[in-house]
Design a protein with these regions (language model features):
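Extracytoplasmic catalytic/substrate-binding loops of multi-pass membrane glycan-assembly enzymes
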Residues: 22-37, 47-63, 72-75, 218-222
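Transmembrane-helix motifs of polytopic, lipid-linked glycan transferases
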Residues: 79-103, 136
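Transmembrane-helix signature of polytopic, membrane-embedded enzymes
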Residues: 92-115, 150
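Membrane-interface transmembrane helices that cradle and orient dolichyl/undecaprenyl
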Residues: 98-100, 135-155, 163, 187-190, ...
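Short acidic/glycine- and proline-prone juxtamembrane loop motifs at membrane-interface regions
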Residues: 122-130
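Membrane-interface alpha helices of multi-pass inner-membrane proteins
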Residues: 152-170, 174-179, 293-304
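Extracytoplasmic
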Residues: 169-170, 219, 345-514
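Perimembrane helix-loop-helix junctions
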Residues: 173-206, 327-329
Length: 515
């Protein structure tokens, strides 16, 4: 009965906390990442085939499903992220119980996970999806070892596949970690279920057919996928690794609380490794702790590679729970338990205020939220969102008026058009089914002139304009038209006629051009 109360409370809390903080401001390029992309899929336009995409197709397809069920609106958009936050929270609770925590402590640490996982951004985001699915896979392997339930072996490759198609990394690193851990598990256990490999294969087969089904049904060219999702991002990854800045601040200082809270677990794992008389339970506990610590290392490396705001602080309550459980088993020191709980409460509060309340992840840490406006003024489908962005941080109402003007002008423009913007809701609001040839436009999504895939992207872009007989390019937002790709495009085609329609809206008439 008590477990049901805990589970119900966790379900409601993890869902509502994300729904609440997702409404607290927006950072257009991140907050609306999959809004129009999901609309494009519903309209019959698919990633890799109809628009250039270097990461995140799984997020787009799942969001399209949410839009089909709940309608194209802000609530259903945020609900997608909230449900994943809930899934991680409930999985964490079950995992904490299985590593030996009492119900109450498992409940408290799970609340911490719900607070620090998805609410930092609140809306569907590729980095959060990829990391959370990797953690779910980590939990699945651990639970498969501890509980001996075949379901978790089946779920592991499915979660890894979902992570990979949310973002390419860190899932490959987790595959290597899992291969090592599972091999070690086989080597150290004599009486092992021989169906483990069969269950892993079955989960992999389910994942394979899901992916192949999407590709075949939607006629997505394999070559496009390989170039956009594998080969071109690899070229970017090589550059990022070369430029990786590993100094004290990046590697130690910003993750210090993850390290501190993990110390009891690390010490316990060390003693378990030195104990040559381990029984089966202790062997499994050693493997599970090693798996989690390996996951922490991978996610810290991933965070350094992404060079984004830190999103892995939800590891703190998980590490606290693991340290708590292993301290009880191998130290039984109440003062150490008090220390773990104190660090957990302090850090959860600290990062909740920084990332949820002050919205640091979406660059609103200096915002005065009393200035935020109801986004319903812009469109009824944004009901619930309190509009304030970093672009007009002191003038959110002005930004809304500029966007309303752009929306009204575009709604009256006849002719086939594509919209280039970070405000990725205009296509869905205007029911414009001619998708932009790129999901979004930034320095990474579009290959640099020096990149060997520059011409591949350029030809892809031009082919979509030609195929869809596009007459107009509209740019909403500042400086998008000044990107090197568009500067070259405009310089090479003197037939293009430009027109500034408002502060945020530029029109480029390409109807007289032949591509």
């Amino acid at each position: 009965m008590k477990n049901k109360i805990y589970l119900t409370t966790l379900f409601i809390f993890s869902l509502l906390i994300n729904q609440y903080f997702a409404n607290r401001g927006a950072f257009p390029i991140d907050s609306f990442l999959s809004f129009d992309a999901a609309f494009n899929i519903i309209s019959g336009n698919h990633p890799f085939k109809d628009y250039w995409l270097i990461t995140g197709p799984f997020v787009d397809y799942i969001q399209a499903l949410f839009f089909l069920i709940f309608g194209i609106n802000w609530m259903s958009y945020v609900l997608h992220a909230s449900i994943l936050n809930t899934l991680l929270c409930l999985f964490s609770f079950y995992y904490f119980l299985n590593i030996g925590l009492k119900n109450f402590y498992a409940f408290i640490y799970s609340l911490g996970v719900a607070i620090l996982a998805y609410p930092s951004i609140g809306t569907p985001f590729i980095d959060h999806h990829s990391v959370i699915f990797c953690m779910l896979a980590c939990f699945s392997v651990s639970l498969a070892i501890l509980s001996k339930k075949n379901l978790f072996w089946i779920l592991t490759p499915i979660f890894i596949t979902f992570s990979f198609f949310s973002k390419q990394i860190p899932s490959p690193y987790f595959v290597v970690l899992f291969a090592f851990i599972i091999s070690f598990y086989f080597f150290n256990n004599q009486n092992i279920n021989k169906n483990i490999l069969l269950n892993l294969f079955f989960g992999s087969l389910i994942s394979f057919f899901l992916v192949i089904g999407v590709f075949l049904v939607n006629e997505i060219p394999l070559e496009n996928f390989l170039v956009q999702y594998i080969l071109y991002p690899i070229s970017l990854g090589e550059e990022r690794i070369d430029k990786l800045n590993i100094d004290f601040k990046n590697l130690i200082s910003q993750f210090k609380y993850i390290y501190i809270i993990s110390i009891p677990l690390i010490v316990s794992t060390f003693f378990l490794a030195k104990n040559k008389k381990k029984n089966l339970i202790k062997k499994n506990e050693f493997i599970v702790s090693l798996l989690f610590l390996g996951s922490v290392v991978i996610l810290i490396y991933f965070q350094l590679l992404t060079k984004n705001q830190v999103l892995i602080f939800f590891l703190i309550p998980i590490a606290a729970a693991c340290s708590h459980a292993y301290t009880i088993k191998y130290f039984n020191n109440k003062y150490l338990i008090y220390f773990i709980i104190a660090v957990f409460i302090f850090t959860t509060t600290k990062y909740h205020i920084r990332f949820n309340q002050n919205r640091k992840f979406i660059e609103l840490v200096n915002a005065d939220f009393s200035l935020a406006e109801d986004a319903i003024q812009l469109d009824g489908r944004l009901k619930g969102l309190k509009w304030i962005t970093p672009h007009y941080i002191d003038r959110p109402l002005d930004e809304i008026h500029f966007l309303i003007d752009a929306k009204n002008i575009l709604s009256k423009k006849s002719g086939r058009k594509i919209i280039v913007t970070d405000y990725q809701f205009f296509s869905s609001f205007l029911n414009n089914k001619f998708t932009s040839p790129n999901k979004w436009y930034d320095e990474l999504s579009i290959p640099d002139r020096k990149n060997k895939y520059y011409d591949v992207h350029k030809n892809f872009f031009l082919s979509k304009i030609k195929k869809n007989k596009i007459s107009y390019l509209f740019f909403i937002g500042k400086n998008k038209n000044e990107m090197y790709f568009f500067e070259e495009f405009f310089n090479e085609n003197e037939c293009i006629i430009s027109n500034e329609l408002s502060e945020l809206l530029l029109e480029f008439d390409i109807s007289k051009c032949i591509f």
